[in-house]
Structures are given as structure tokens and as C-alpha cells.
Amino acid sequence: MQRPHPILSPDRIAPSIPCSRPDASTLEATALIDGEVDMAYALITGASSGIGRELASLFAANGYDIVITARNQERLNTVQTALKQQYQVRVVVFAADLSEPDAPQRLHDFTTSHGISIEYLVNNAGFADWTGYLDADWSRQQKMMRLNMEALAELTYRYGRDMRRAGHGRILNISSVASMMAGPYMAVYFASKAFVRSLSEAVAYELRDTGVTVTCVCPGPTTTGFAKAANMHGRNFFTMTRPVSARQLAAYAYRRMMRGTTLAYHGPLTRAGALAERLLPRAATRRLAAFMNGGEPNTRSVSATPQAHPERSAQD
């Protein structure tokens, strides 16, 4: 039996909890269960900070037991403790790097083997990289594709099949305003978010009569650790717009998911991007994206050598 879906205002969401970054050993997949597991859960990826952290708070505030996953074990443990104390819900931690090829399968195997039925799936984990395509660190670009596209697609596939079998369930995929156009100097990221939007719309249609919904939310600039991790801090995309808080975006995405909306654009920039996608020539939107990404359209190369980037993303 499905529970009701009360929707709390953003000011009812628990604040994010800062936590220092642990060493790389915490990236190994581990799982901690407190108490027996016998109810339907919400699964949120990239739940240790930012939008994912706020979505985890929303589900907990509305009485849902949750599974939270990210790479950073210490941060996940902090979130687990805070949500259990504040909302008296079960919080299961599964620490793993979802860009590893077998990680989505291991996550699904874990929940299945422990009798955890995932009624709500939130694919939030992802990251970006600001650099010229040919100047990028290829291993980082490959990691981005695996996390932003492959992990999301596999989790949607595996848990979507479970939901279809059960006759109910909701999937929320976080895309971006970047999904609407080609993005010079962030080519792989923009392409990955277009993949998320296209996949979400197609699967939503296929599942239209099954009791399972797929919602794709396309946010604009949001105040998380995303820009710093992507080496974008101070670029036009953030300086010429007014970013919303992770809490505001999470509340919007939660409402849209619960309503079963297929495609949702959050904020004026994203709605303007959707309009530009329909009305402007592709050449114009490419130049616009290049400018908003902080590079000039006629610049041949952003940097002579790949830049070092912090290994931090929405999946931390």
C-alpha cells in the first residue's frame, strides 16, 4: 500500500550539515543497516550534500524510510545520524562510486538481498568539467559519462523493472538547462544531460499505463559544490544569473515527482533555454552556450594542458 504524499515547504527541510572530506579509503562500497528492513524506501544518489542531501531530508520529513548513496562514507554517516534523529525514519547508507562499472548492479543487489523495496528512485549524482574537449583529461570525461549517463540509465532500468512488476513507483532524474543545446567548453556534460532528458521522456511514455512515472527536472544555476568541482566558479553562467538554493530546487523537484510530471523546467533561465531551443537556430544556441560557459565562441582552445580538478561532485 502506498503512503500519502504530503509536501512540505522548503523552510521545513533540515539544513545541510558540513563535514570534512575523508581519505580515499572511504570510497569502497559499504552498507550500514540499522534495524530490520521491511518497508518501501526512497533511494537517493549523490545524497551526501547539495540537492541530493535536501531531497533526502524532504523524503525523511514526509515520513519515508530512505537509502542514501554517495562516495563519501563519513558524510553519509553524518546525514544518516541527522535524519534519523530529526525525523525518526530508517536511513540505510550504501557508500560507493557509481561511476565504477559494477556499482549500480551492486547497489541493486544490496537492496534486493536485504528486502528493501525501492518505491522512489532519485538519480541525482553527477558532475561537470569546464575545459576544451581536446584539452580535457580523458579519464575524467569517461568517468563523467559513466556517472551522468550509464549509472543513471542502469539504475532506472533495474529499479524501473521492479516498480513495473509491483505496479507502482516514481523515478526522478535530475537533468539540467544544459540538456537543451550543445555546450562548447563543457561538451560532454551538456551531451550527458541531453541524454538524461531524452531517456527520461522516452521511458516515461513506455511506462505510462503501468503505475510508474518518470520525472525529469531541468534546473538552472544552483548553489551547491557543483560549480567549484567543475572549475566554473566565477564563470558567466553563475555571475550573470541568480542561482537558487539547493533547498528550493529540491522542494520543486519533489513536488514534480509526486505529481508525476514528465518534464519540468525550474527557474527563468531554464524556461528561457527551452524557448531558445524551439525558436533559435542551433548555431545561435551554441554561441550562447559558449558565452555562458565563460569561453568565447571563436576561441580555439581553452587551455594548453588539462587542468587538475578536485575529485568532488554531486555523488560525494
Model-derived segments and their meaning:
Residues 176:
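Residue(s) in the substrate-gating loop at a strand-loop-helix junction
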Residues 156, 192:
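Active-site helix of classical SDR
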Residues 62-78:
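Conserved glycine-rich Rossmann-like NAD(P)H-binding loop of the short-chain dehydrogenase/reductase
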Residues 206-270:
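SDR active-site lid
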Residues 124-129:
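Conserved NAD(P)H cofactor-binding loop of Rossmann-fold oxidoreductase domains
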Residues 132-134, 140-145:
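Substrate-binding pocket helix/loop in short-chain dehydrogenase/reductase
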Residues 48-49:
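Conserved glycine-rich cofactor-binding loop
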